[in-house]
């Protein structure tokens, strides 16, 4: 996800402490779900560009090397909306779910396949001893969220949380995203209702579209095959853990792009979509962007580029559901709807309003917290509207899907589809990379048509909303 209209960057993970103080460094909780360690390499090898698979049966992290190639530091691979926080506490806040309702028999809470990205948990080593401002996602995560969640649920949803935040608050960001849009509310509600008409409930939808829960061996196999398809074997470290609150976290660690995947929520179809989203879209466009004369803020200003966020997130969101039999845009639609409603409702009103679409209280809590980010007194109407960019970007791309040069759009890096023709003569296209799923453009465009049909999007209506 992208914070601003400039170059998309990944958030740097905090510097690793000295080797002599291992207790100070937060470790990924190892997984014991799948028996003995898959890979016999000890952590002492410190091989770059590896697939890290923690195991409870061995104290050191196991590494499976994709390649021995060394990756140069890529400053363009810092994503501002990705989290670097990996925590084991506060997973649910109301105790463990009973077996059969959100729990894996092997341990760990299963998160729905399309639930929200985690709001980064604040780390003491980030807050203290640093003069730098915290990243947006940390600054906007309430420091007392677990306590307020407990109060909220104990009140039977009658209490409006009173959130506290780490200082300083990013006021310029809050002001930028304080207004919600209603431009695409009809489309958002239409998508949500289409899902519920077909599946009955959100929970049924997740069970049907998420696919089977994957073992470590299956995850590693899928990731390895995907990296081979994209020709980026050896470039991205992949870590498997049971200690993530999110489904996946993209970060830069020791100057290397690192993708951490949550074992307890890794499902077949979600994992494939996540790889197209994170690697096939964000990562490859970032690599291509680093080769272009507009890779810097100054370069973007020189070429007069439009904000890249809607295109970037629209593409990534479309790629998440690409090739699914039923590619519903549920998450983007519900985020858009939730933020619009939050602008006019208190927290408890919003929570109750979402019940018509989502019965799972934990999922509703996540959506409400994201929509109310930055608010102290949530009894007041107000929203943090940034997450509306997903549906906004999706619909803009679908509106112009027949005229967009998708391969060139990817090759030019972090740019809007509106700037492609302007930049065509200036792009450095030598050795740029296009994701494998975009090379057959006929098939790719057919999938976009399938997405239009499945989500009941009307061509004429999009034309009226987004005229040329």
UniProtKB/Swiss-Prot annotation:
SMART domains recorded: DUF1704 (SM01154)
Keyword terms, alphabetized: Carboxypeptidase, Cytoplasm, Cytoskeleton, Hydrolase, Metal-binding, Metalloprotease, Protease, Zinc
Record's keyword annotation contains Plastid: no
Ligand binding (Zn(2+)): 277, 282, 313
A molecular function GO annotation: metallocarboxypeptidase activity
EC number in record: 3.4.17.17
Catalytic activity as recorded in UniProt: C-terminal L-alpha-aminoacyl-L-glutamyl-L-glutamyl-L-tyrosyl-[tubulin] + H2O = C-terminal L-alpha-aminoacyl-L-glutamyl-L-glutamyl-[tubulin] + L-tyrosine; C-terminal L-alpha-aminoacyl-L-glutamyl-L-glutamyl-L-phenylalanyl-[tubulin] + H2O = C-terminal L-alpha-aminoacyl-L-glutamyl-L-glutamyl-[tubulin] + L-phenylalanine
InterPro entries the UniProt entry points to: MATCAP (IPR012548)
Highest rank taxon of the organism: Eukaryota
Main location: cytoplasm
A GO term from the CC aspect: cytoplasm
UniProt xrefs under Pfam families: MATCAP
Active-site residues, Swiss-Prot/TrEMBL: 278
Cofactor(s) of this protein: Zn(2+)
Cofactor note: Binds 1 zinc ion per subunit.
Alphabetical GO biological process terms: brain development; proteolysis
Domains: entry comment: Metalloprotease with an atypical HExxxH zinc-binding motif instead of HExxH, which interrupts the active site-containing helix without affecting the integrity of the catalytic site arrangement.
Family note: Belongs to the peptidase MATCAP family.
Known function: Tyrosine carboxypeptidase that removes the C-terminal tyrosine residue of alpha-tubulin, thereby regulating microtubule dynamics and function. Also able to remove the C-terminal phenylalanine residue of alpha-tubulin TUBA8. Recognizes adjacent tubulin dimers along the same protofilament.
Record's protein name: Microtubule-associated tyrosine carboxypeptidase 1
